[in-house]
């Protein structure tokens, strides 16, 4: 029976000797017709872990069909035997994870810190020979037993190799942009980081100034200002249209008020300018209660007009009756008109609460 060899960290006891071959040296007496006895030889141990059926780290040997199927697609298609260290591929994979965090994470700094910590933990476990079991691998990587078939196959292949020569790896050359580069920021009073996704530059590091982004922001601000200016102009035009319509209505109202004042219907006591001319009504009345605002000026003009009319009438009478009779009649009529107009002016002044105007002396 062959001796079963286990890994260097898992010793397996040797099987008991067969009762047919008791311990101790064999007899030295040769048997006739047989070859001389040869010394007992120890079998050469196989490679580590080859004959271990249920390995505590990667379990039983996986089914080759499961390794082929899940190693080609799905969550388990991330490792394939044989494994070789590739720092360039490792750097590209980590940068890809940083990109996903930068474009979608709410707490970018916290998530990138968790990724870096996970990478370090796996290295530290391997460095200190803390080897997770098969269920532990499945729980850490969130894989089902079938999906972990390629992983168990790669781990078994690594365990069957000889001891590796230690060496120090050089830094890889990673194609940019580097999404994991962050600027250090101060923490707030609560102790939480204030780093947000906008602090990452998708054209490079955020610590570098990007003139193109600033130009785009300035262009956007200018466009917003132009749009706001156009909106304000439109609002001013609309307000101007409304004001214009209102002015038209106000002008119409003012025109109606002026017409009413001229007719003498609405007297508001406002002053009338010297340029306003009083037009006597067509019925021949003396215009008492007219819409003139200032009684003194309007009455003086009315008296002057009456005097002109009386003088014209007097001239006609002079032509008909003679100079003597005409002059007497004219003087009498003028005196009567003056007395009547004085009384009417006094009544208007008393009604308006003003003093009756003083009429200048009539010319001889």
UniProtKB/Swiss-Prot annotation:
Q: Spell out the Pro residues composition-biased ranges.
A: 12-46
Compositional bias ranges of the Low complexity kind: 355-364
* Region listing for Disordered, in residue ranges: 1-73, 173-364
Chain intervals with Acidic residues compositional bias: 181-191, 207-286, 294-343
- Any single GO BP term: regulation of gene expression
Tell me which Pfam families the record gives. Answer: Herpes_IE68
| Keywords from the UniProt entry | Early protein
Classification via InterPro entries? IE68
- Into which family does the record put it? Belongs to the herpesviridae ICP22 family.
This chain's protein is named Transcriptional regulator ICP22 homolog
Q: Which organism is it from?
A: Suid herpesvirus 1 (strain Kaplan) (SuHV-1)
């Amino acid at each position: 029976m062959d001796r079963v060899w286990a890994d260097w960290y898992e010793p397996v006891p040797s099987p008991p000797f067969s009762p047919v071959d008791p311990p101790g040296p064999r007899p030295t007496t040769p048997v006739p017709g047989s070859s001389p006895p040869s010394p007992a030889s120890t079998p050469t141990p196989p490679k580590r872990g080859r004959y271990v059926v249920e390995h505590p780290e990667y379990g039983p040997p996986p089914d080759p069909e499961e390794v082929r199927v899940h190693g080609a697609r799905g969550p388990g298609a991330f490792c394939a035997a044989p494994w070789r260290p590739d720092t360039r591929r490792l750097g590209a994979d980590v940068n890809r994870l940083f990109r996903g965090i930068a474009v979608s994470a709410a707490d970018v700094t916290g998530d990138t810190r968790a990724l870096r910590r996970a990478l370090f933990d796996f290295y530290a476990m391997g460095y200190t020979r803390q080897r997770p079991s098969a269920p532990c691998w499945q729980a850490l990587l969130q894989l089902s037993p079938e999906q972990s078939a390629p992983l168990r196959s790669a781990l078994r292949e690594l365990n069957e190799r000889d001891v590796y020569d230690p060496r120090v790896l050089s830094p890889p050359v990673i194609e940019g942009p580097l999404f994991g580069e962050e600027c250090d920021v101060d923490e707030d009073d609560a102790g939480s980081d204030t780093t947000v996704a906008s602090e990452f530059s998708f054209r490079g590091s955020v610590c570098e100034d990007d003139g193109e982004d600033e130009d785009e922001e300035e262009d956007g601000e200018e466009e917003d200002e132009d749009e706001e200016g156009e909106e304000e102009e439109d609002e001013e035009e609309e307000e101007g249209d409304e004001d214009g319509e209102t002015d038209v209505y106000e002008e119409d109202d003012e025109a109606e008020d002026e017409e009413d004042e001229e007719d003498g219907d609405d007297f508001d006591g406002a002053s009338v300018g010297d340029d306003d001319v009083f037009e006597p009504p067509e019925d021949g009345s003396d215009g008492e209660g007219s819409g003139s605002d200032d009684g003194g000026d309007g009455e003086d003009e009315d008296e002057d007009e009456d005097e002109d009319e009386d003088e014209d009438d007097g001239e006609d009478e002079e032509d008909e009756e003679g100079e003597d009779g005409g002059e007497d009649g004219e003087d009498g009529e003028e005196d009567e008109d003056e007395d009547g107009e004085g009384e009417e002016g006094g009544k208007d002044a008393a009604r308006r609460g003003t003093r009756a105007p003083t009429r200048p002396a009539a010319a001889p």
